[in-house]
Amino acid sequence: MTGPLAAARSVAATKSMTAPTVDERPDIKKGLAGVVVDTTAISKVVPQTNSLTYRGYPVQDLAARCSFEQVAFLLWRGELPTDAELALFSQRERASRRVDRSMLSLLAKLPDNCHPMDVVRTAISYLGAEDPDEDDAAANRAKAMRMMAVLPTIVAIDMRRRRGLPPIAPHSGLGYAQNFLHMCFGEVPETAVVSAFEQSMILYAEHGFNASTFAARVVTSTQSDIYSAVTGAIGALKGRLHGGANEAVMHDMIEIGDPANAREWLRAKLARKEKIMGFGHRVYRHGDSRVPTMKRALERVGTVRDGQRWLDIYQVLAAEMASATGILPNLDFPTGPAYYLMGFDIASFTPIFVMSRITGWTAHIMEQATANALIRPLSAYCGHEQRVLPGTF
């Protein structure tokens, strides 16, 4: 074949064997950075003002004036509860805290070196396997309540198991935060500790389309069940680039040991271009609005738990990072030492995060199910073009 048609085919064949040029490729957003994939009425992050609201309320105001139960109701229902609604909500939460013998047996059989996040993920899968209810909206609200109520019991059992201690049963006469602390330590600690813990739970409860929340919405978009969506979210949160930062913060502070070492430790890290955990945020560019509330909570806990050393290390690192890089702390930076002073094992910090974020995850799961569309993005192929299989290989 000769002439213009043959020439055109020759050019086409040549192009098919080469990767597309930059101009020919679509606009790829690695990590979906800057991509708006849906609407949500649950929370709003405004990077320009470093603000975060839940259903329109500033999170720092909620942390200062509300209980975690009130915030959970707000995230799920869209409005703060009346006194009567809160009483009924709390009654149902307290009635749902216990785990049965089969769950206790399952937790006891898990290896001692099992990652605490694997314990939480396995427990949620088991709850889903034994739940006979349908997956309609009303049932999902009840399932969300069950997970919120039972997760503290599971996390406390696992932490005590690792310490060689027997579990402590939930106390129906105590509020959410007091009950969890009692199940962990056998007593209700100082008011400053209870208050700081509850505030941390409110501050961690929800944060838009982060990786774990988006994972939950992706699973939900396939019309899978709520437990599968939460399990997917837990798997995402286990990853080092999403959860675990408050654990890393505390490991770093322990490595520093003395406030006098903090400045040189940080300078050496920066010289090696290593990431400093607890600083910076992909969304907030000029500071995390949750930090001042949690820093004050850390200071209160430090006062009653002899935590001046960690407060001093915090101050040195924060000041030096701001001076050297302009990067400010995120919520994980004050939460790490706060949880450590409360007495929690470092390995349990991220499971505690799950206890909080279960409210935000399930709010998003229910919102996704209400106006669902299968989440199915496209990809740009960059491998070999179609090839002929050789006769022998």
From Swiss-Prot:
The active site is at residues 242, 281, 332. GO terms for biological process: carbohydrate metabolic process; propionate metabolic process, methylcitrate cycle; tricarboxylic acid cycle. Substrate binds at residues 92, 207, 290, 357, 376. Keywords: Transferase, Tricarboxylic acid cycle. It catalyses: propanoyl-CoA + oxaloacetate + H2O = (2S,3S)-2-methylcitrate + CoA + H(+); oxaloacetate + acetyl-CoA + H2O = citrate + CoA + H(+). CoA binds at residues 275-279. Pathway: Organic acid metabolism; propanoate degradation; Carbohydrate metabolism; tricarboxylic acid cycle; isocitrate from oxaloacetate: step 1/2. The keyword Disulfide bond does not apply. One of its GO terms (molecular function) is 2-methylcitrate synthase activity. Disruption phenotype: Cells lacking both prpC and prpD genes are unable to grow on propionate or cholesterol as the sole carbon source. Its EC number is 2.3.3.5, 2.3.3.16. The keyword Transferase applies. SUPFAM superfamilies: Citrate synthase (SSF48256). Induction: Activated by PrpR. GO terms for cellular component: cytoplasm. Belongs to the citrate synthase family. Homodimer. Involved in the catabolism of short chain fatty acids (SCFA) via the tricarboxylic acid (TCA)(acetyl degradation route) and via the 2-methylcitrate cycle I (propionate degradation route). Catalyzes the Claisen condensation of propionyl-CoA and oxaloacetate (OAA) to yield 2-methylcitrate (2-MC) and CoA. Also catalyzes the condensation of oxaloacetate with acetyl-CoA. PANTHER family: CITRATE SYNTHASE, CITRATE SYNTHASE, PEROXISOMAL. The vitamin B12 restores growth of the prpDC mutant. It suggests the capacity of the MCM-dependent methylmalonyl pathway to support the metabolism of propionate independently of the methylcitrate cycle. This is 2-methylcitrate synthase. It comes from Mycobacterium tuberculosis (strain ATCC 25618 / H37Rv).
